Amino acid sequence: MEQQKESLWVKRYHFETTDSTNEQAKRLAIEGASHGTFVTADAQTSGKGRRGRSWESQGQTGIYLSFILKPEILPQNASMLTLVAALSVSHAIKNVLGESYIPYIKWPNDIVINKKKICGILTEMELKQGKIAHIIVGIGINVNQENFPKEIETASSIFLETGNYLETEKLIEEVLNCFEKEYAIFLETQDLEGLKEDYESLLINKNKQVTVLEPKGSWNGTALGITNKGELIVDTNMGCQYVSSGEVSVRGVYGYV
C-alpha cells in the first residue's frame, strides 16, 4: 500500500493585524520555526512589495500570506520560487473561480485579471555562511475589496474584476495546495524546466511589446517567454536579451501590461 506523502505545511500562525506577514515569518524563522510554517493576517499595517514598494492592505478583504521554506538549493536558484508562487496563485484563483476567468501572470510575479493587478508576491532570502538559512515567500491577494485609491489605478480585486465574492480561507487553502505541487516539480530539477510551458501559457507579456526599465535607462522589445531560470527572453534589434527579475521592471509599451 502506497504511503501518503506528508504535507509541506506544518504549522499556521494567524494574526488579526500585523506589520507584515513577511516580517512575522522572518521573526519566526530566526526563532527556529520549521520549514513549511506559514503566517496569515486579516490586515497589515506595513505590507511590502517588490523593489521596496508598499502594498495596500485592507482588513479582512484580502489574503496576506507568507511561508517559511528551508530548501537545500543553491542561493542563486531561490529567485525562481517567486515565479513558482505566481503560477500557484494563478492556478488557485482559477480553481476557485472556475474556467470563466483566466488570472494571467505579468512577468515575473504579478497576477492580473482584465489587465488589472490583483496579486503581488515578494520573496526574501537569508543566507548563513553562503547557504540558505531560510526563504520567505509573501503573497498578497486583493480578494473582496470594493474600491482603491486613485493613485494605484492599476490595482484591483477579484471581486471588482469578476463580480465574485470569494471565501478567503478557501482560497488560502487552494494556494497552499497548488504551491505544494508546483514546489515539488521545481525541486526535481531546481529550476523551472517542468513548469516553464505552464507558466508561459499564462504569461500576459508573451509575444507582446514590452518596455524594460533599468537603472541606466529603458529599451523596448518583444517578450518571447522565459528561460528555465525564469529570465524573460526579449527579442530586440540587437538579438535576444535575457532579463533577470531582480534588476528591472517590465511594462507594456502602452500601459501596465
Question: What residues fall within each predicted segment?
Answer:
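N-terminal lobe of the biotin/lipoate ligase/transferase fold
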Residues: 1-98, 102, 119, 166, ...
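Long, positively charged amphipathic alpha-helical accessory segments at protein N-termini or as interdomain linkers
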Residues: 75-102, 113-257
